[in-house]
Amino acid sequence: MSPIEQIYDKIPDFAKDVRINLTSLMADETLSPRRKYGVLVASAVATRNSALIAAVESAASGVMTSVAIAAAKAAASVVVMNNVYYRFVHLASNPEYKTMPPRLRMDVIGNPGVDKSDFELWSLAVSSINGCGICIDAHERTLRAAGVNSETIQTAVRFAAITQSVAIALEAAGPASPQAGD
């Protein structure tokens, strides 16, 4: 049984829609395998669900290099920092914050070790999970400028949403909840 199938089996019956969406996600071929699993790794890391992270990373190792997996994790870790900062700048009433330099190190964005549009797509997925509108707009603009189409962008965000819903369903089930189909 694959790591993703093991996660599927842990999703409780109250989250049947989540199971169906996970099945659809795994069958979807809109994204290349590297893009797909990069979105899944970055999104799983953004959920902070250790079981989901381990399963997705294990599955990703069959289609991604260790460098690409590390880049997806780097996307999640640096983007969450930017999400918190820029969401604050956007929501704060004081306009002075918009004029201040962020002073946040983020060199990995300039040299992620993988195709920049892949890294940008993974970053968009994380920004979508974290709800940073400024970041979402910036990633979407960069992707469009790189020639990435709307369907690819929407698919990455849909995969991020499904990944987040899987994490929530697993957490809501708790450790002693019955497995799917029990």
Curated annotation (Swiss-Prot):
Put simply, this protein is called: Alkyl hydroperoxide reductase AhpD
Keywords of this protein's UniProt record, alphabetized? Antioxidant, Disulfide bond, Oxidoreductase, Peroxidase, Redox-active center
Record keyword Disulfide bond present: yes
> What InterPro entries does the record tag this protein with?
AhpD (IPR004674), AhpD-like (IPR029032), AhpD_core (IPR004675), CMD-like (IPR003779)
Annotated active site: 132 (proton donor), 135 (cysteine sulfenic acid (-soh) intermediate)
An example GO BP is:
response to oxidative stress
Q: What does this protein do?
A: Antioxidant protein with alkyl hydroperoxidase activity. Required for the reduction of the AhpC active site cysteine residues and for the regeneration of the AhpC enzyme activity.
The molecular function terms in GO held by this entry are: alkyl hydroperoxide reductase activity; disulfide oxidoreductase activity; hydroperoxide reductase activity; peroxiredoxin activity
Q: Which reactions fall under this protein's catalytic activity?
A: N(6)-[(R)-dihydrolipoyl]-L-lysyl-[lipoyl-carrier protein] + a hydroperoxide = N(6)-[(R)-lipoyl]-L-lysyl-[lipoyl-carrier protein] + an alcohol + H2O
Organism's domain of life?
Bacteria
* Family of this protein: Belongs to the AhpD family.
Which EC main class describes this enzyme? oxidoreductase
Please give the organism: Bradyrhizobium diazoefficiens (strain JCM 10833 / BCRC 13528 / IAM 13628 / NBRC 14792 / USDA 110)
